[in-house]
Design a protein with these regions (language model features):
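Catalytic core of nucleotide-activated saccharide and alditol-phosphate transferases
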Residues: 135-230, 238-239, 350, 355
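Structural alpha-helical scaffold elements that stabilize or flank donor/cofactor-binding regions
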Residues: 118, 156-157, 259-260
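Conserved catalytic-core segment of nucleotide-activated headgroup transferases in glycan assembly
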Residues: 86-92, 99, 192-263, 272-276
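N-terminal pre-catalytic "stem/leader" segment of glycosyltransferase-like enzymes
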Residues: 12-138, 163, 171-178, 184-185, ...
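Catalytic binding pocket for nucleotide-activated donors in carbohydrate/polymer assembly enzymes
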Residues: 70, 75-83, 91, 95-96, ...
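Alpha-helix C-terminal capping/helix-to-coil transition sites in glycosyltransferase folds
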Residues: 121, 160, 262-263
Length: 368
């Protein structure tokens, strides 16, 4: 059951949550007023000044982070996926993040969309911001990791968080200029225990693309096919755009992807328009390179800079055609780029790396 906002932009706490807060700090009830039998409203005016629980509890949590008492802290990862659909990339992303946080010593729970507001004791919320907004509880440390759909997040929403991580250096720099809350760049990453090199001859394809259409004929596939290249495609919705003999399947399980990535000669990658415009590099780039895969991607700056030029990008259909032909005929060049890219990812872009970055950033936060 989700919290709501009323007309005066006050935060609504449902009765069970209110009772929990009241028990922890009886003084808080003076800041609450009844609206009906099911809801209590806490005034949003000078939020941190009025919420006595937040005033004292957040510094205690921060002190434990600074002193590395991670085993005394519980982290809730708010995953955007619904319980009924665990094929979303967010679901696997959440579990990889959980594993790395637990290695660090934290107690970690994953809350899928329907369980975001369950009555559980939490110290730190890490919200993987995708399609839906999360209405935060101010007595906990709240972290947003904006990994997709940046066009759907307002400045007002960002400002409610103690720290905001953005999976794009370009967008993070834009937000730093106009937000008061702390903003840091935190790119996506990979789990090398899930994505690693493992070639299988029966999965060897010249050119592979994995992804759904969302009712859009994705440009990199369109450009490749119109130039006469044979692309093996896995994903939902392609019947509308291409011959069925090119469609190899609708879905590859996440724990099988590494075999397909490792075995193909060229993996094609692209970005949705909002991600490309704001330079959010796809998680597929990290996963594929961890498998030692050669990748050609649409042209975004971070695809080149993050991986030291070991991702090949293209400008238009003619450029793509030339690069596909060249690299199919030069396996040594493919392997050289893939090997260097893998080394960069394993050294710099794993979930363990990102958890270290998150913890160091949390140590520096201040409560406004």
């Amino acid at each position: 059951m989700e919290k709501l906002l009323n007309k005066s932009n006050s935060y609504v706490f449902y009765k069970s949550e209110y009772e929990k807060l009241k028990k922890e700090n009886k003084k808080l009830k003076n800041n609450l007023k009844k609206t009906n039998m099911n809801k209590k409203i806490y005034s949003n005016k000078s939020k941190r000044a009025q919420n006595k629980l937040a005033k004292y509890r957040k510094p205690e949590i921060l002190d434990k982070i600074i002193n590395e008492k991670y085993e005394e802290l519980t982290v809730a990862i708010k995953s955007p996926n619904p319980v009924a659909d665990r094929k979303w990339g967010d679901y696997f992303f959440s579990h990889a993040l959980k594993k790395s946080l637990e290695k660090k010593g934290f107690n970690v729970i994953i809350q899928e969309r329907e369980h975001w507001y369950d009555d559980v004791d939490v110290d730190i919320n890490i919200v993987l911001r995708g399609l839906r907004n999360y209405f935060i509880n101010f007595d906990e440390i709240n972290v947003m990791w904006n990994i997709s759909h940046p066009d759907m997040v307002s400045d007002e929403e960002y400002e409610k968080y103690d720290i905001v991580f953005i999976a794009s250096e370009k967008h993070a720099n834009i937000l730093k200029e106009r937000l008061n809350t702390q903003v840091e760049t935190l790119f996506q990453c990979t789990d090398p225990e899930v994505f690693f090199t493992h070639k299988e001859d029966n999965l060897c394809e010249d050119i592979l693309f994995v992804g759904v259409t969302r009712k859009v004929y994705r440009q990199i596939v369109k450009d490749s096919l119109e130039k006469g290249h044979n692309v093996s495609i896995y994903g939902v919705g392609w019947e509308e755009f291409i011959d069925e003999d090119l469609i190899k399947g609708e879905f590859i399980p996440n724990d099988e992807l590494y075999k397909y990535y490792s075995s193909c000669k060229i993996l094609l990658n692209d970005h949705w328009e909002d991600m490309r415009d704001l330079d959010f590099p796809s998680n597929r780039l990290f996963d594929a390179l961890a498998c030692g895969t050669f990748v050609i991607s649409d042209d975004i700056p971070s695809a080149k800079t993050l991986f030291d030029g070991n991702i090949v990008t293209y400008r238009d259909a003619d450029d793509l055609d030339e690069k596909i032909i060249y690299y199919l005929n030069n396996p040594q060049k493919r392997e050289e780029l893939a090997k260097k890219g893998k080394e960069i990812v394993l050294n710099n872009h794993t979930f363990d790396n990102r958890v270290d970055e998150i913890v160091e950033a949390l140590k520096d936060i201040s409560f406004r």
